[in-house]
């Protein structure tokens, strides 16, 4: 009888009581976001019209490494946390690798992804402030579904702008949001000035996260007692996601191992930061030798081909100016099925860490991600979301290197969500309809030309 342990699960009383704020430990702090009107460093009160006040302070906190998780939020975390750390014996066998592969299974949440970790927190802070309405954007619909559920939990009305290509590709995510009472609008739309401007110039525009953010911000500004919420990119969102890595840290101890490589797929940075930052703390403070890999789509390679500049997080220029690796806020990504990764820029924390060499980035073509996603499903029994397939592909690449070297490296990746509502994407892959989208240098240069140098 085998004594090998497959899953490592923490009891409820070991769910983290604090989020980890890596900004407090970074030797080189991120450059300050700028007020778009004055070009002066952003102050928390500059963000009050958009976000709940506590979130504004979390966003710019450079001093406190540990932020207490409100007890109400932690009680809701118990609905699905802790999430399992799983030893991927099946994948190891399929690859014939000596590497030890682990994944943190965030697909077990009620929504099927990691996004609920921040949605519950943001909705809680909005409710505490007396807010009645929240708006947001969503790509594939994972964040929109999470925010819709969290809003319902705290008695808030939710309005979601979903990127049009994903709105059409993933109708069941729309149904999930509507099940929780949210109003869902395809973006760009004619309901906002930002949307009208884009559709006037490009009537068949299929949308982008940057466009959907503009519309959600505009609606929040024009709706009484309303706040905007965001699913990635900003630092407070990444903060909430560190519950993933903090749990994984304890679970790796249970497994008797420590990762040589930690991997997360990359859209705006919250999923990557959530799994990586708690381990990166040991690299910064103790000199642990761990590689941290952000796996991004070849069609939206902001980390591997973008420039480090001050840029907006949205197409219309409503957000603060963020110091980040960007392809330009006017960038229109290809219509890949990993809708949650179709964002032009990276969060300020990740951008600074990449600039300082504390992490690395890897771009992965669409077809390779689906190939690896199918291999993972066949060997581990979980169909991964197209976004998560990027992390799997990066893990497979690293595990194959171990075949050549004979090293038993320990690889940890975050399975950010399941793909059971993304089967139309898999259908297109099996039918041979999907293709690889790769950007040319001249396309990137043209897109970057729209950035005003600060």
Which residue stretches match the model-derived regions?
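Claisen-condensing/thiolase-fold acyl-transfer catalytic domains that form or cleave C-C bonds
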Residues: 266-270, 274, 366-424, 428-432
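Short glycine/serine/threonine-rich phosphate/pyrophosphate-binding segments
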Residues: 116-120, 136-154, 168-171, 266-276, ...
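Positively charged, low-complexity intrinsically disordered leader regions
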Residues: 3-131
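Active-site nucleophile and cofactor-binding loops and adjacent substrate-binding regions
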Residues: 105-116, 134-143, 234-237, 263-268, ...
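Alpha-helix C-terminal capping segments
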Residues: 121-131, 145-157, 178-179, 276-286, ...
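A short, small-residue-rich loop immediately preceding and capping a beta-strand
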Residues: 118, 126-165, 258-272, 292, ...
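Active-site-proximal loop->helix
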Residues: 143-206, 302-314, 423-431
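Active-site/ligand-binding loops adjacent to catalytic centers
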Residues: 68, 197-236, 244, 256, ...
């Amino acid at each position: 009888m085998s004594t090998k342990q497959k899953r490592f699960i923490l009891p409820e009383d070991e769910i983290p009581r604090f989020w980890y704020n890596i900004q407090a430990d970074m030797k080189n702090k991120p450059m300050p976001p700028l007020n778009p009107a004055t070009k002066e460093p952003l102050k928390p009160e500059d963000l009050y019209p958009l976000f709940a006040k506590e979130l504004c302070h979390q966003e710019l906190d450079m001093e406190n490494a540990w932020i207490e998780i409100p007890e109400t939020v932690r009680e809701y975390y118990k609905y699905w946390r802790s999430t399992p750390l799983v030893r991927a014996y099946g994948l190891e066998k399929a690859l014939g690798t000596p590497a030890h592969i682990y994944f943190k299974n965030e697909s077990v949440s009620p929504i099927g992804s990691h996004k609920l970790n921040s949605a519950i927190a943001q909705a809680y802070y909005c409710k505490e402030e007396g807010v009645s309405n929240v708006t947001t954007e969503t790509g594939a619909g994972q964040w929109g579904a999470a925010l819709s559920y969290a809003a319902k939990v705290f008695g808030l009305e939710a309005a979601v702008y979903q990127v049009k290509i994903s709105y059409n590709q993933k109708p069941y995510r729309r149904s999930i949001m509507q099940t929780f009472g949210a109003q869902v609008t395809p973006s760009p739309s004619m309901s906002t000035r930002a949307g009208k401007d884009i559709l006037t110039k490009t009537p068949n525009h299929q949308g982008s996260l940057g466009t959907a953010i503009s519309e959600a911000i505009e609606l929040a500004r024009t709706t009484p007692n309303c706040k905007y919420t965001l699913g990635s990119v900003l630092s407070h969102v990444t903060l909430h996601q560190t519950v993933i890595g903090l749990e994984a840290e304890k679970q790796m101890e249970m497994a008797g191992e420590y990762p040589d490589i930690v991997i997360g797929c990359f859209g705006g940075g919250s999923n990557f930061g959530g799994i990586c930052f708690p381990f990166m703390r040991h690299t910064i403070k103790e000199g642990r030798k761990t590689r941290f890999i952000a796996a991004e789509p070849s069609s939206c390679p902001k980390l591997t081909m973008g420039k480090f500049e001050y840029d907006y997080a949205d197409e219309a220029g409503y957000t603060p100016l963020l110091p980040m690796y960007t392809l330009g806020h006017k960038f229109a990504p290809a219509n890949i099925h990993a809708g949650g990764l179709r964002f032009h820029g990276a969060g300020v924390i990740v951008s600074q860490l990449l600039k300082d060499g504390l992490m690395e980035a890897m771009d992965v073509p669409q077809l390779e991600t689906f190939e690896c996603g199918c291999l993972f499903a066949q060997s581990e029994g979980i169909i991964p979301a197209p976004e998560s397939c990027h992390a799997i592909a990066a893990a497979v690449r690293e595990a194959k290197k171990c075949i050549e070297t004979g090293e038993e490296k320990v690889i940890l990746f975050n399975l950010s969500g399941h793909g059971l509502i993304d089967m139309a994407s898999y259908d297109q892959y099996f039918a041979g309809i999907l293709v690889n989208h790769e950007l040319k240098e001249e396309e990137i240069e043209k897109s970057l030309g729209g950035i005003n140098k600060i």
